[in-house]
Amino acid sequence: MKIFQNTKNVIVSIAWAAALCTSAVSAQTLTSNSTGTNNGFYYTFWKDSGDASMTLLSGGRYQSSWNSSTNNWVGGKGWNPGSSSRVISYSGYYGVDSSQNSYLALYGWTRSPLIEYYVIESYGSYNPASCSGGTDYGSFQSDGATYNVRRCQRVNQPSIDGNQTFYQYFSVRNPKKGFGNISGTITFANHANFWATKGLNLGNHNYQVLATEGYQSRGSSDITVSQGGSSGGGNSSSSSSASGGGSKIIVVRARGTAGGESITLRVGNTNVATWTLTTTMTNYTATTSASGGSLVQYTNDSGNRDVQVDYISVNGSIRQSEDQTYNTGVYQNGSCGGGNGRSEWLHCNGAIGYGDI
């Protein structure tokens, strides 16, 4: 619940301003400390001062906004009680930049022992793995990334049981997710199990939320959280050459910005599957025995259409889009495919390459 480093630059979140123009009938805006349930999800909102606010929307969606008048705040939606075996998916907008002291994280508490834990997906100016006086416990692989683990101690600080002395556990994603449009999956069992091998045990779960946090900074977020990864969705078609009980299960996690965008999964010289995207980040699954270079190709760019591909997985092994250097559809350096790739985005007809399978 606590961040320790000061920042003071200002950002303008265009996406947040646009979101404010669309009102939701069920919206409830919080400006004072509160916990409860909303549309089937638990929520928490806490601040120690200032103008931070959080708006509860349908399902697992919430929006937040804060400025430098707020010393420290944290809020989000999720579940109470939490679970060590939960798989969490999230998507939306994280409106900060590298000068702002903020986290986007799976955040929760346990009792007996009293533990505050974070799985940090993205952060701004301050890396929590550098917390003063902490102990490093190595790293492990999960959900297509490396997570660095650190334990810190908080002495006589706010907790779910008032001011207490307790440990914090951090898993910090490397590479961290970017800013702006964002999505991902957190397999929390991988974190809880690794922590336990290092003697970092959790207790009885209290709440567990996908949280935004800020400290003496300015920003906004618009986040939707759900349990597990969705599958199917949209319209799909598979080529005959990809059917017949192939040996590889490939999942493409993607969405369109307008809906109706078309993507094709290619392996070698085979069109394995073609899907028509919705605006919801969705897992699209295909089975194939084809081998060779793999790519996801965007084929019907027009108007305000863009495609965001979070990752592909091959038999459960995730390959993140932002780790790939082959991307001919992202708009960089003034042209489509004009940069070094390493992006989830296809702004133009083009493809992201994911290597041989």
Curated annotation (Swiss-Prot):
Region entry Disordered, spans: 220-245
Reactions listed under catalytic activity: Endohydrolysis of (1->4)-beta-D-xylosidic linkages in xylans
Record-linked InterPro entries: CBM60_xylan-bd, ConA-like_dom_sf, GH11/12, GH11_AS_1, GH11_dom, Glyco_hydro_11
Active site, renumbered: 116 (nucleophile), 213 (proton donor)
Pathway as given in its UniProt record: Glycan degradation; xylan degradation
Keywords, sorted A to Z: Carbohydrate metabolism, Glycosidase, Hydrolase, Polysaccharide degradation, Secreted, Signal, Xylan degradation
Keyword Cell division: no
Tree of life domain: Bacteria
Subcellular location: Secreted
Main location: secreted
All residue ranges annotated as the GH11 domain in the record: 29-226
EC numbers for this chain: 3.2.1.8
Endpoints of the signal sequence: 1-27
Annotated GO CC locations: extracellular region
Inducers of expression: Induced when the bacterium is cultured on xylan or beta-glucan but not on medium containing mannan. Is repressed by glucose. Transcription of xyn11B occurs later than transcription of xyn11A. Is expressed at maximum level in mid-log phase, and its transcription persists into the late exponential and early stationary phases.
Matches recorded under Pfam families: CBM60, Glyco_hydro_11
Example GO molecular function: endo-1,4-beta-xylanase activity
Biological process, per Gene Ontology: xylan catabolic process
Similarity field: Belongs to the glycosyl hydrolase 11 (cellulase G) family.
Its biological purpose: Endo-acting xylanase which specifically cleaves internal linkages on the xylan backbone, releasing xylooligosaccharides. Is able to hydrolyze glucuronoxylan and the arabinoxylan from wheat.
PANTHER family the record matches: ENDO-1,4-BETA-XYLANASE A-RELATED
UniProt protein name: Endo-1,4-beta-xylanase Xyn11B
Gene source species: Cellvibrio japonicus
Taxon lineage: Bacteria, Pseudomonadati, Pseudomonadota, Gammaproteobacteria, Cellvibrionales
